[in-house]
Amino acid sequence: RSRIRTSISAIAIAVAIIAVVFARGLISGMIDSTFENHINYKAGHIRVIDKEYKLKERLFSLNYVLDGFNGEGTSIMIEKLKQVEGVKQVVPRLKFGAVVSMEDELVGMMGWGVDPAEEIAFTRIDEKIIEGRMVELGSREIVMGTGLLEKIDRVVGDKVTILYTTPFGSFKGSTFQIVGKVQSAIQMLDDTIFYLPLDQAQRILEMPGEVTELLLITSNQYKAASILPGLNALFSQEDKTGKYILQVWNKDYELIGLFEIVTKIYNFVYIFIILLACFVLVNTLIMIVNERTREIGMMSALGLSSREILYLFTMEGAIIGVIGSAIGTVLGGILTKVFSVVGIDYTAAMEGMSGG
């Protein structure tokens, strides 16, 4: 019976360790993936925007944009930002709302005017293009997400006329050739986003030298805040209007702050699971001791002290714990590795949520 209870204790500990290792791997992976997408498609490591744009970003406002320090253009601004210690890359983007007219409906979408070279270096978007290629500066061409192409019934090689509104209120249309199809890990982006060369976006929107945001990239995302003093010094010297603000990826976004709180909560859950497994082990040892009172009496008669007898039972519990932990760690690691390669399909769970 002691062997059965010992085995049950080892199995309980192993199961607890497997649960902790797998859950921690799964949740950490999901959070890291969320952080990566947030950085790539939203915030960079530090984002430079107009302070008014922050309030009207959801409206795709083009009235509060970056036009450089004191209106000198973003090209000079980018060069000055690159000179700040710690800034490895500056990624410009010009985001705007647009529509494509179908027979009986208007399909809404969002255009991203980008520098192809900078975008490839930052987000590796070329690896996500499953057909065709990335856009090139100076060319009237676009890359669309897989879902968006299906919505407008187009394929790579077709031309499409996109309707949009300029900052001056003019409603215009421009025709582009579709040169690539992109499929990212975020279905909502694939259903709504198209990329075009930054110079073409600035031309059609009548916004020469202007962008909606600049993403600053550092060598370590978790140390991005350390370069703020240098950036603040530059902006205090160059930005006389004081209209620009700096947003750090993990400090100025409420959602990311919530994820950090969730991580701490899960750490307490992991500890609680381990404590439950320890309780099973302690309970088993108590039952073993109660069943072996005669054996304990014989050990006392042979001259073993109470401390030595306690030591023997403690070592027995430690061995059970080590064996269970080792088995759980190995199996949990294997399980986590398998799912990290195979992945988990959330399509059914997320069905109907992508349109938000």
For the regions a protein language model found, what residue spans apply to each?
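Short acidic/glycine-enriched loop/turn elements at secondary-structure junctions
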Residues: I76-Q177, R203-L205
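Hydrophobic, regular-secondary-structure patches
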Residues: R24-M110, R133, G138
